Amino acid sequence: MRHKHGYRKLSRTSSHRKALLKNLAIAIIEREKIETTVPKAKELKRYIERLVTVARNADFNTHRQVFAALQSKEATKKLINEIAPKYEGRNGGYTSIVKTRIRKGDATPMAFISFI
């Protein structure tokens, strides 16, 4: 049984899931709005909100911690220098998920996830 399980598996191995979330996080940081499936968007929301909370500190160790999660210099710089300062006075709730459509090929519910 999966009672009180802490995260969505997304039908992937742990390494595949980590790579997926990292790539989706880089995409939303670069574009600030992406379309993905609803379960992926919900899991990405948890992942990216933790990163933004860490990035608000903006010291040297924060750069290292964010880079360790993203492995992208450009995304790390943009998150720490542009995105995180917007949310200085806000405690969480940096992203929003808007359900959009049902994908034609496999009837999967899709959603936009974007920074507020």
UniProtKB/Swiss-Prot annotation:
The keyword Ribonucleoprotein applies. It comes from the Bacteria. Keywords: Ribonucleoprotein, Ribosomal protein. One of its GO terms (cellular component) is cytosolic large ribosomal subunit. The keyword Repeat does not apply. InterPro entries: Ribosomal_bL17, Ribosomal_bL17_CS, Ribosomal_bL17_sf. One of its GO terms (molecular function) is structural constituent of ribosome. GO terms for biological process: translation. Part of the 50S ribosomal subunit. Contacts protein L32. Belongs to the bacterial ribosomal protein bL17 family. This is Large ribosomal subunit protein bL17.
